[in-house]
Amino acid sequence: YNNTKILDRINWRVMAGEKWVLAGGNGSGKTSLLNMIFGDNPRAYKCRIRLFGRQKGSGESIWDIKNRVGFVSPEMHQYLPAGQSVNDVLCSGFYTSEGLYNKPTSYQRILSKKWLQLILLGHLSDLPFNVLASSHQRMVLVLRALIKNPPLLIFDEPFQGLDPENIAVMKNLLNSIAEHTNCTMIFVSHFDDEVPASFNRLLTLNKGKVVSSE
């Protein structure tokens, strides 16, 4: 961008079922890399990026990609329409939409409530999402990423603003999913103690370059 390299010669191969931590300080390129993978950045189509065994930009739409990826970021709650219930927000995850514009099935409604019960928030199901504490909003958005059981999950600082008790609840959930599914998972955090134990691969960036991969 403007003659500045944001990402420089990144070579990263993520195999199905692997659990990766993406590390690096502010400005290291983590978010830019995730945007190249998941977002609709036009520069991504000029790079050698393969998703699910296929060159990005070889005919698939951005929705084809998003339907196979569960994603959560610290900013996501800002893009959701006000007034929709917690259950609505969770059900929107089935449709990869920012807000619920389809009519969910009874099964989807029930499944959404069961996910909330897993993290002890079942009593919040019918409340407007925007009245929740920010920590509870972030927990719900993690569930939204999980709910459609996608082959790839990307968590960009998912525990930002959570207290230690809620972090422990969410770590236990992600560990359970990592251990019992073949879902590929990428986790970004500035804090090592937030990383679920089952994430055993590490890519570290600094100034847009890979400094270690293990």
Each predicted region: which residue ranges?
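Helix-to-loop junction immediately C-terminal to a conserved catalytic motif
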Residues: 38-39
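The feature captures the beta-strand-to-loop junction immediately N-terminal to the Walker
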Residues: 23-25
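Hydrophobic anchor residue at the start of the ABC signature
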Residues: 142
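A short, proline-enriched helix->beta-strand linker immediately N-terminal to the Walker B motif
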Residues: 147-151
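Catalytic Walker B motif of ABC-type/P-loop ATPase nucleotide-binding domains
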Residues: 153-157
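ABC-family P-loop ATPase nucleotide-binding domains
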Residues: 74-131, 137
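Conserved structural motif at the start of ABC-family nucleotide-binding domains
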Residues: 6-9
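ABC ATPase NBD Q-loop/coupling interface
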Residues: 48-64
